[in-house]
A protein has these predicted regions:
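Active-site pocket-lining/capping segments in soluble small-molecule metabolic enzymes
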Residues: 1-163
Length: 163
């Protein structure tokens, strides 16, 4: 994970063979920073790492990794993945990042690769999403939004950036 070309060069000196372009940067900031690496174009992004296991606290420890869901006051559901080995949770955003439909802007940034992060998707949904991205990014054609996303996704900081 490299915020600028100087950090990227330092990471490479220490043996990193692939870097990730920060999802916090917007399109202009990515272009201006000179950061090279792979770019996340799909995935539920981590919002928080909790220092305690929600599963263990609420239902008792099962000793195996699993997905639970938190619901907020607006009925948004946030996936929670427990990491049993170290007894903590990763809480993900309720909507996945999706840069489907923005392939011209993304490829214009010349990332070394694009990456889809699958975390909580069912296999069939992951297949639909992968097919749509392959169609658009792999063959440079405009792809239809897979039904599984149903307009429930975010563009993240790609159009906004961090303030």
């Amino acid at each position: 994970y490299s915020w600028n070309h100087l950090a990227g060069a330092a990471m490479e000196r220490y043996g990193a063979d692939r870097l990730t372009i920060p999802v916090e940067l917007n399109e202009r900031e990515i272009r201006d920073s000179g950061v090279q690496g792979e770019m996340i174009v799909y995935g539920y992004l981590p919002m928080m790492i909790s220092a305690q296991c929600i599963r263990k606290t609420t239902l008792g420890c099962s000793g195996k990794p699993e997905i639970m869901w938190l619901k907020d006051r607006k009925d948004m559901r946030f996936p929670v993945v427990n990491q049993c080995r170290f007894c903590y949770n990763t809480i993900y955003n309720s909507a996945p990042l999706s840069l489907l439909g923005l392939s011209e802007q993304v490829t214009g940034l010349k990332p070394n690769a694009v990456r889809l992060n699958f975390t909580v998707e069912e296999p069939a949904a992951a297949g639909e999403i992968l097919d749509a991205f392959f169609e658009e990014y792999g063959m440079s054609e405009k792809a239809a939004e897979p039904p599984v996303l149903r307009n429930q996704f975010t563009r993240g900081h790609f159009k906004r950036g961090v303030e």
